[in-house]
Amino acid sequence: METRRIKNQGAVGSCVAHSLSSIIEYYNYTQTGDDRPMSVGYIYGNRRTSDYEGEGMIMRDALEAVRQYGDVAHEEFPYNEEVPKMIKLFEYNGRKLFKKSYPNRISQYARVTSQNAIKSALMAGNPVLMAMVWYADMEVVDGVLTTSCLGYDGGHCMFIYGWDERGWKVQNSWGEDWGNHGCMIVPYDMDIEETWIVSDNIIENTTLKKPFSCMLSRPIAKIINKIVKIFNK
């Protein structure tokens, strides 16, 4: 897998939305050749305020929002503001764009906990969304993230696009001047809190007339769809 364009979230707590928009860009480019930048603000503004307060997003909620509603091109929704302003912008303008965002959905996602599962996903061409604790003393030295775990600075979301003998190849959203041109190696022994496989492998559901999304294996999903077709005859 290759990295996508390096983005910069600035002072806005939109790391989850930045990573997800980059993943959608990856799928658009690899599947159709479409290299347009996708909107961070559309994903961030679609955050459900009833679930929690404060900045940022819960990864699972963000994944579900992108599965249901997708994303639009950056030019359609070019905002990167902090909440609650971002949510108000979305409520005013974002809902008008559902028809354009719907084709840019992910089809399914699943949480994984083993290194082998992460590597299998990457080999299949699926990026892996990740979250880890961030410390104030973290820095990238010779391309590798280092820390003494001093000064807890909250959680941070990025995405994994590969690996080597040193650790996971990770793309960040702090601009090209950060780390190794915006990327880094996260050592295998460094604590990662969450990892999610993000897939754009759409399976058609003939009953609902829309993509069938689940966390079942593809063979099982195919069997389900065959049964559905039989009962639809």
Q: Could you tell me what each predicted segment is?
A:
Residues 11, 17-25, 49-171, 176-221:
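Predominantly the structural core of cysteine protease catalytic domains
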Residues 2, 33, 174-176:
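Homeobox/homeodomain signature
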Residues 38-48, 133:
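Acidic/histidine-rich, metal-coordinating catalytic segments
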